[in-house]
Design a protein with these regions (language model features):
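Short, amphipathic alpha-helical interface elements at domain boundaries
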Residues: 1-86, 198-209
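Residues that form generic nucleotide/phosphate-binding pockets
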Residues: 10, 52, 56, 70, ...
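Extended intrinsically disordered, low-complexity coil regions enriched in Ser, Thr, Gly, Ala
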Residues: 29, 34, 40-45, 99-102, ...
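Short, well-ordered loop/turn elements at secondary-structure boundaries
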Residues: 41, 92-93
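Accessory beta->alpha helical hairpin/"wing" motif in late/C-terminal subdomains of nucleic-acid enzymes
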Residues: 44-58, 98-128, 134, 140, ...
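Leucine-rich, amphipathic alpha-helical/linker segments
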Residues: 60-86, 90-92, 128-155
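Acidic, Ser/Thr/Pro-enriched low-complexity segments and adjacent helix/loop capping patches
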Residues: 72-82, 94-110, 114, 172-185
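Short hydrophobic helical membrane-anchoring segments positioned at the boundary
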Residues: 124-209
Length: 209
């Protein structure tokens, strides 16, 4: 399973068949970061989403922020689906989740709950420890924070401060640290843009009144 697929799988709530409301943009940024990692280091041939991510990387690079921002549109052009849907389609093809049920907000029933549980258990152990982490686990853990999955990784409130520190520093002093930093920067810039737009709208409403 690709790292991006692992993140998407744990983000799907088995009860609802969907990710949490309001997290799609955050998940897209994190999935884009994982696809960049896999495009650079995964040597498996003929994986369509990785091949498409490599093309986006070639077209939009070398600045990681530009690549991350371009990933969703780039995958739509190449695969016909945006980042989240393209990654989930890989889970559907592997029969890990069921095809979308066709509702307005599509749901994907998790078929391989044991695989989902194994990923969560691995991340919880990583977040709770201070031991060095395998690269794949460190990369995936680093994305659970910006993907708003902290409570999944650290269900006990008392453990969340330590887990947050592990998440935020999982890739420190590694070759993949720039990916983690760029994902967070893209999301911070997006949040700042929303805040500015809201302020402008509020000022406009006051002055027009």
């Amino acid at each position: 399973m690709l790292l991006a697929e692992e993140l998407a799988l744990i983000a799907i709530d088995p009860d609802s068949g969907r990710h949490a409301i309001g997290t799609r943009d955050k998940l897209n940024a994190c999935l884009a970061g994982l696809l960049v990692v896999e495009a650079q280091f995964d040597e498996r041939p003929d994986v369509p989403i990785i091949d498409a991510a490599r093309e986006v990387l070639d077209d939009a690079g070398p600045k990681l922020k530009s690549v991350l921002s371009a990933m969703n549109r780039g995958l739509v052009r190449r695969l016909g689906s945006g980042t989240w849907d393209a990654v989930v389609q890989g889970l559907v093809a592997a029969e890990i989740v069921a095809p979308a049920d066709g509702t307005v907000r599509p749901r994907h029933r998790v078929l391989e709950t044991a695989q989902r549980d194994e990923i969560i258990d691995r991340l919880r152990a990583a977040a709770a420890s201070d031991d060095p982490l395998p690269v794949n686990t460190a990369v995936l853990l680093s994305m659970t924070g910006p993907a708003q999955l902290l409570e999944l990784v650290a269900p006990e409130r008392a453990a969340r401060k330590h887990a947050r520190r592990r998440i935020d520093h999982a890739l420190d002093a590694t070759a993949l640290e720039p990916v983690s930093q760029s994902v967070r920067k893209v999301l911070a810039d997006a949040a700042a843009a929303v805040a500015v737009a809201s302020s402008v709208a509020a000022i406009g409403a006051v002055t027009s009144g």
